[in-house]
Design a protein with these regions (language model features):
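Metal-dependent phosphodiesterase/phospholipase catalytic core, i.e.
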Residues: 1-112, 126-129, 133, 147-149
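C-terminal active-site rim and adjoining tail of enzyme catalytic domains
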Residues: 30-34, 108-188
Length: 188
């Protein structure tokens, strides 16, 4: 929680009541005042009435949270968000479990800065509809290989215009960004 709040430590070591006491707007200084960490259910309730598509990243690669996949899917279904969600994780066993539980919801194989050799083949083989690489290591050859296997690409973390232009030129399906104003400005 150090990276995104004014708290310190691991999420697993706190109850939700304790997590709500941390300021999730810390990274923006005083711009938004105090913003408590929302629960995933609070997010789903809010998202239900918004016109948006959400990448739900399961943070299970370092610490595994028992039944996180089942609980996540239950909330997605409770709020009717199945057609506006994509699941991703660095832990590909976790997204394999998501595919077992909710085969109708697309999944993306999230990978670090080393990428995956033959990512399209890999994703197709495991039933993942998307490949989520670091955009800085993605090559045009990677894009072609994925497309040859019917696998879409959502690259991360695209925070500047130059990276966005390259991915649009390569006909990637989506970007993951910390600054939504960048693609909004580009596509205006």
């Amino acid at each position: 929680i150090d990276r995104t709040t004014d708290g310190s430590g691991w999420v697993k070591d706190y109850t939700y009541e304790e997590l709500k006491k941390f300021n999730a707007a810390r990274v923006k200084g005083d711009q938004f005042g105090f913003q408590p960490v929302p629960s995933f259910e609070e997010y789903c309730a809010w998202a239900k009435n918004q016109s948006l598509f959400t990448n739900v990243e399961l943070k299970t690669s370092i610490i595994y949270y028992p039944e996180i996949e089942e609980k996540t899917i239950a909330l997605i279904r409770k709020y009717g968000l199945e057609d506006r969600i994509i699941f991703s994780s660095f832990n590909h066993l976790s997204i394999l479990r998501m595919k077992e539980l909710a085969p109708e919801i697309p999944c993306g194989a999230l990978v670090g800065d080393r990428g995956l050799k033959y990512a399209g083949f890999y994703c197709e083989r495991f039933g993942f509809e998307f490949y989520h690489p670091d955009f800085q290591t993605l090559t045009e050859e990677d894009v072609k290989e994925c497309k040859a296997h019917g696998v879409g690409i959502n690259a991360w973390t695209v925070n500047g215009m130059e990276g966005l232009e390259k991915l649009v030129e390569w006909d990637c399906e989506g970007i993951i960004t910390n600054y939504p104003e960048v693609p909004v400005k580009y596509f205006k």
